[in-house]
């Protein structure tokens, strides 16, 4: 029986690939290990050829989109910071207070 970590997965920390494969072979069997290894090799080969995942052009477009989102979020944050002091002044102004929403207001 192999060691397991808190999440129930095999503990592979500090093991070589050979030791990990041996432990997996004992755990799931040789055919399952073969299928997992074959699948991983296939995924790696497709990624190298650019047939799987984002292409270089796709990555550039994705990065541009991420940057636009960061810029938009930054603008929204700046706008919120500018509006917050105005709202704080309105709350301090007793004419704009409602008695059921502000504690300590005499209105």
From Swiss-Prot:
Its main location: mitochondrion. This is Uncharacterized mitochondrial protein AtMg01040. Keywords: Mitochondrion. A stretch of 270 kb of the mitochondrial genome is duplicated within the centromere of chromosome 2 resulting in the duplication of the gene. The expression of the duplicated gene is not demonstrated. It is found in: Mitochondrion. Residues 1-20 are annotated as: Disordered. Residues 1-14 have a biased composition (Polar residues). GO terms for cellular component: mitochondrion.
């Amino acid at each position: 029986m192999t060691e397991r970590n808190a999440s129930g997965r095999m503990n592979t920390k500090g093991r070589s690939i050979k030791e990990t494969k041996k432990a997996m072979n004992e755990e799931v069997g040789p055919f399952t290990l073969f299928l997992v290894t074959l699948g991983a090799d296939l995924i790696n080969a497709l990624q190298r050829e650019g047939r799987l995942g984002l292409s270089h052009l796709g990555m550039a477009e994705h990065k541009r989109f991420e940057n636009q989102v960061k810029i938009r979020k930054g603008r929204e944050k700046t706008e919120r910071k500018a509006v917050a002091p105005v709202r704080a002044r309105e709350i301090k102004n007793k004419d704009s207070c409602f008695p059921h929403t502000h504690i300590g207001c005499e209105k």
